[in-house]
């Protein structure tokens, strides 16, 4: 570690540098874990939110996940085309659509979550349960300071 610290110089003590490196490792392993499903992290996130809040509208999903409104339509269309989410005209506002997860969507979410749990177990194998809880707490504190997060 000391040799690596010297090689990266002034980056070594920067938390953002290490967050970016950790994210890169997580993202690459996540992509490998999802191989063959046709799913990406953003799609799994949307599917999970809609599953937990049946009837939610796409604007609310976007706000919860920090996805720009302009990107939500194509992402929802992708999930609808995959037959994982159904878009239904909202009875209270005919201009709006509510979202629900289909049976295929529930099965896909179950499959993805099992793969994600295995991916996280592998990635965090060197951490105790207490360290994982601390990591989640610390990351949550950083997220709550992010004005773009909501």
Predicted regions located by residue number:
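Pre-recognition alpha-helix immediately N-terminal to the DNA-recognition helix
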Residues: 18, 25, 29, 45-48, ...
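Helix-turn-helix DNA-binding motif, specifically the short coil turn and the N-cap/start of the second
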Residues: 57, 68
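Key DNA-contact positions within bacterial/archaeal DNA-binding proteins
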Residues: 42, 70
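N-terminal leader segment of winged-helix/HTH proteins
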Residues: 1-37
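Charged, amphipathic alpha-helical coiled-coil/dimerization segments
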Residues: 27, 55, 77-140, 144
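The alpha-helix within a helix-turn-helix
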Residues: 62
């Amino acid at each position: 570690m000391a040799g690596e610290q010297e090689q990266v110089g002034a980056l070594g003590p920067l938390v953002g540098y290490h967050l970016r490196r950790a994210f890169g490792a997580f993202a690459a392993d996540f992509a490998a874990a999802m191989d063959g499903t046709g799913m990406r992290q953003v799609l799994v996130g949307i599917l999970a939110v809609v599953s937990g809040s049946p009837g939610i509208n796409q604007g609310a999903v976007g706000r919860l996940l920090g996805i720009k409104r302009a990107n939500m339509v194509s992402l929802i269309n992708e999930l609808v085309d995959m037959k994982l989410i159904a878009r239904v005209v909202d009875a209270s506002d005919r201009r709006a659509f509510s979202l629900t997860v289909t049976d295929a969507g529930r099965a896909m979410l179950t499959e993805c979550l099992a793969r994600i749990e295995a991916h996280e177990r592998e990635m965090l194998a060197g951490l105790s349960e207490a360290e994982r809880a601390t990591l989640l707490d610390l990351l949550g504190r950083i997220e709550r300071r992010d004005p773009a997060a909501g």
